Curated annotation (Swiss-Prot):
Name used for this protein in its record: 2-C-methyl-D-erythritol 2,4-cyclodiphosphate synthase
Presence of keyword Metal-binding: yes
Coiled coil ranges: none
Gene Ontology terms for molecular function: 2-C-methyl-D-erythritol 2,4-cyclodiphosphate synthase activity; metal ion binding
Biological role stated in the UniProt entry: Involved in the biosynthesis of isopentenyl diphosphate (IPP) and dimethylallyl diphosphate (DMAPP), two major building blocks of isoprenoid compounds. Catalyzes the conversion of 4-diphosphocytidyl-2-C-methyl-D-erythritol 2-phosphate (CDP-ME2P) to 2-C-methyl-D-erythritol 2,4-cyclodiphosphate (ME-CPP) with a corresponding release of cytidine 5-monophosphate (CMP).
Stored CDD domains: MECDP_synthase
Enzyme Commission designation: 4.6.1.12
Length: 162
């Protein structure tokens, strides 16, 4: 029996370092540090890309866009997301909804979440009402609680496109 739905879960984490722009959900957030990574290190879009690819059974972002490939150095994660989602759609799936949690001490996520939702809705061609982004802290526990990095967890629901 073919199931008409699939669920994918994505996770990513990047360290905060001075001297880099902080790009989360495709939004340039004014902050004293940015995320360290081979691409723009957009932790939210990396976790979302993994959730979509995983749900479709298409691997993960590291296989599709390896950080050992110089072609992806400094890459815009929105471009990577759109390319990955094109593969998901080519495999016969489309996104139904996205639920994301960003975990960090700072910056505050809530003021930037609406712009992140707009970007994701545009990149996936879906209704913004089907996308939810939350910000959480770890009450000063762990690396995120100490302000050393940002983590993202994303769940995505796909439905058969046919």
């Amino acid at each position: 029996m073919k199931c008409p739905f699939r669920v994918g879960q994505g996770f990513d984490v990047h360290a905060l370092v001075p001297g880099r722009a902080l790009i989360v959900g495709g939004v340039d957030i004014p902050f004293s540090a940015g995320l360290l990574g081979h691409s723009d290190a957009d932790v939210l879009l990396h976790a979302l890309t993994d959730a979509l690819l995983g749900a479709a059974g298409l691997g993960d972002i590291g296989r599709l866009f390896p950080d050992t490939d110089p072609a992806h150095a400094g890459a815009d994660s929105r471009v990577l997301l759109r390319e990955a989602y094109a593969r998901v759609k080519a495999a016969g799936w489309e996104a139904v909804n996205v639920d994301a949690t960003l975990i960090c001490r700072a910056p505050r996520i809530l003021p930037h979440a609406p712009a992140m939702v707009v970007n994701i809705a545009a990149d996936l061609g879906m209704d913004a009402a089907a996308i939810n982004i939350k910000g959480k802290t770890t009450e000063k526990l762990g690396f995120t609680g100490r302000g050393e990095g940002i983590a993202a967890q994303v769940v995505a629901l796909l439905a058969r496109a046919d």
